[in-house]
Curated annotation (Swiss-Prot):
Cofactor: how bound: Binds 1 Ca(2+) ion per subunit.
Origin species: Mus musculus (Mouse)
Gene Ontology MF: a single term: protein-glutamine gamma-glutamyltransferase activity
Active site: C255, H314, D337
Glycosylation sites recorded in the entry for this protein: N151, N219, N288, N456, N491
EC number: 2.3.2.13
UniProt-recorded name of the protein: Protein-glutamine gamma-glutamyltransferase 4
Subunit composition and interactions: Homodimer.
Length: 670
């Protein structure tokens, strides 16, 4: 053959801008092409001469971190399909050939090498595709796709059910190295497993946790001197970028940080995801669908008996996908949780667990549905432990059937507001459906289950949980209800602790005891504790603290006892931020912040910071101490590097006051 007639590939143009716009991947900060499976993309091939009918033109795609690789070989001349892929010649003009390639809707996701004949055309990423109706992560609503795939900022919801606080969070799934980091973490999957969002999401969930050899190390000790305190993080980006560069675990995280990086990773690879908060979240170590709390007669928790716990809140991630591994009816949202709590198949992970199975009490549906069901549905039993002639006697004094799994929350689609999604997880408390679900999950008849969790107390107790301005005295309003109006003497005992959101008690603040005579069918009792009992202990651990405890009321004549618990979160409002509404790329803008120390103690280890995806780096400013009553003002100059609406988060942090923040969206023009 005349060498002048040999077909030679001079170049392959992957039409990066054109394809990225069509595939909703323009925001990824990588020089490589990013595509979504099941959708057409275009290649422009430059030849040494016009293509002729007898010429052989083959396009080969290979992927996989294990041998043998996943390989697809296509012939645009014949247009035959291979593994669901197809290529066609869309246009031919002289030495230019335009190829339209359609990848399979169930193709392996990950990095691909592309070759046209012997010409190496580079590397691209192939993602799951919620826009493709044949993809198992298909999501029909454009508004939901914009939120759960494309939105790179959002909120975590924290606090407790009666005082929900929002924490701005930057997911940053399009930032530099994030996509590469996510696919690097999937090395343990076989090539064919990379087709399946169930297996990919479970693997990503596993690898977010350093205990499994992954990204983030959990720590709830209050000592974070050799890392970053969990409450300091407001973005997934520095965590995943640090792990990508160092290949070492990042220190430290707690549940909302694990959810943040998991949501980022899932959105990055194309699986719709949302961070979800469950308030009053049960941790049932015995898997008996109850949380058992044991108290002494003053209301103090007995640690060696109390193995279960109730977290003020717990944050996990929901991912959207079809469950082709389960019977019909379990598609849609699935719970995934990277927080290291329980071992599942040899590693710390939870899910994916279908919300429909959780709601129906079908705890046998994989994965880990029993654990999630108890978090949102369990009953809380409070036991009084009495010492009687050197023997302990446990007396059940409270059964709470509606105190766990409250106000399950996520960011609303298209709005910077909280959405309550509790009814996606469970039927209304006390409804016939809820009783049937509890019976199904527990394996007991519904009547038996209902009776076993009912106490016929003549006295009922509740507490009004007010917010607590940091530095103010503690005020508790106890309400006692009964059927009789006969005067009765009642002993009240309230034990309060400074503790973390998981219920981990750092110090006991004291016991308030009071004997009152109640009249009528409803009475109120007021308990107080001076701020000095807690204010000097705020800096003892590097965690955001709450006040929590139990209250026991005893009718003196009959000895009948009832109990309830209380939680108080601190508020601190002496913080203001001023920043412009508009700015320009590469032109400095000034942010001014003021903070007043209203406490009677000095604040130490002060740090102000400004974060935004519109900035090249986080900006920070530090000061050792702010004396009582002192106001400090700082100005920080920031230079935006990205155009468009950019969210700026300004934070104040100290050893005693953990994270006060403000946020504002600034419109940055070119």
């Amino acid at each position: 053959m005349d060498s002048r007639n040999v077909l030679i590939i001079y170049a392959v143009n992957v039409e990066r801008k054109l394809n990225a716009a069509a595939h909703h991947t323009s925001e990824y900060q990588t020089k490589k092409l990013v595509l979504r499976r099941g959708q057409i993309f275009t290649l422009k091939v430059i030849l040494n001469r016009p293509l002729q009918p007898q010429d052989e033109l083959k396009v080969t795609f290979t992927s996989g971190q294990r041998d043998p690789p996943y390989m697809v070989e296509l012939d645009p001349v014949t247009s035959y399909r291979s593994k669901g892929w197809q290529v066609k010649i869309a246009k031919q003009s002289g030495v230019e050939v335009i190829l339209n390639v359609i990848s399979a809707a169930d193709a392996v996701v990950g990095r691909y090498k592309m070759r046209v004949n012997e010409y190496k055309a580079g590397v691209f990423y192939l993602l799951f595709n919620p826009w493709c109706s044949d993809d198992s992560v298909f999501m029909a609503s454009e508004e939901e796709r914009a939120e759960y795939i494309l939105n790179d900022t959002g909120y975590m919801y924290m606090g407790f059910a009666k005082q929900i606080k929002e924490k701005p969070w930057t997911f940053g799934q399009f930032e530099k190295h994030i996509l590469s980091c996510c696919f690097n973490l999937l090395f343990q999957l076989e090539n064919n497993e990379m087709q399946n969002p169930v297996l990919v999401s479970r693997a990503i969930c596993t690898m977010m946790c350093a205990a499994n050899g992954g990204v983030l190390m959990g720590n709830w000790t209050g000592d974070y001197a050799d890392g970053t305190a969990p409450y300091v993080w407001t973005s997934s980006v520095p965590i995943l970028q640090q792990h990508y560069v160092t290949r070492m675990p990042v220190r430290y995280g707690q549940c909302w940080v694990f959810s943040g990086i998991l949501t980022t990773a899932l959105r990055a690879v194309g699986i719709p995801a949302r961070s979800v908060t469950n308030f009053e979240s049960a941790h049932d170590t015995e898997k008996n669908l109850t949380v058992d709390i044991y108290l002494d007669e003053s209301g103090k928790t007995i640690p060696h008996l109390t193995k279960d716990s109730v977290w003020n809140f717990h944050v996990w991630t929901d991912a959207w996908m079809k469950r082709q591994d389960l019977p019909h009816g379990y598609d849609g949202w699935q719970v995934l949780d990277s927080t290291p709590q329980e071992i599942s198949d040899g590693g710390f992970r939870t899910g994916p667990s279908p919300l429909t199975a959780i709601r129906q009490g079908l705890i046998q549906m994989k994965y880990d549905t029993t654990f999630v069901f108890t978090e949102v549905n369990g009953d809380k039993f409070i036991w009084l432990v009495k010492q009687n002639q050197e023997r302990e006697k446990n007396i059940l004094i409270a059964v709470e059937t509606a105190s766990l799994g409250k106000k399950i929350s996520t960011k609303m689609v298209g709005e910077n507001r909280r959405e309550d999604i509790t009814l996606q997880y469970r039927f209304p408390e006390g409804s016939p459906e809820e009783r049937k679900v509890m019976a199904k999950a527990s394996g007991k008849p519904s009547d038996d289950k209902l009776n076993s969790r009912t106490l016929n107390n003549s006295l009922q107790i509740s507490v009004l949980q007010n917010s607590l301005e940091l530095g103010a005295p503690i005020y508790l309003t106890i309400t006692l209800k009964r059927k009789t109006a006969t005067p009765q003497n009642v002993n009240i005992s309230c034990s309060l602790n400074l503790q973390t959101y998981t219920g981990n008690k750092k110090t006991n603040l004291g016991v308030i005891q009071k004997t009152v005579q109640i009249h009528g069918q409803e009475s109120r009792v007021f308990l107080t504790m001076d701020a000095s009992y807690y204010i000097y202990k705020l800096g003892m651990v590097d965690d955001e603290m709450v006040i929590g405890g139990f209250i026991i009321a005893e009718i003196v004549d009959s000895g009948e006892r009832v109990a309830t618990d209380t939680t108080l979160c601190f508020l601190y409002s002496a913080f203001s931020v001023e920043m412009p509404s508009t700015g320009k790329v590469k032109q400095p803008l000034v942010i001014t912040s003021k903070f007043t120390n209203t406490l009677p103690i000095p604040l130490t280890n002060i740090k102000f910071s400004v974060e935004s995806l519109g900035l090249a780096n986080m900006k920070s400013w530090e000061q050792e101490t702010v004396p009582p009553g002192k106001t400090i003002t700082f100005q920080m100059e920031c230079t935006p590097v990205k155009a468009g609406p950019q969210k700026f988060i300004v934070k104040f942090i100290s050893r005693q006051v953990k994270e006060v923040h403000a946020e504002k969206v600034v419109l940055i023009s070119k």
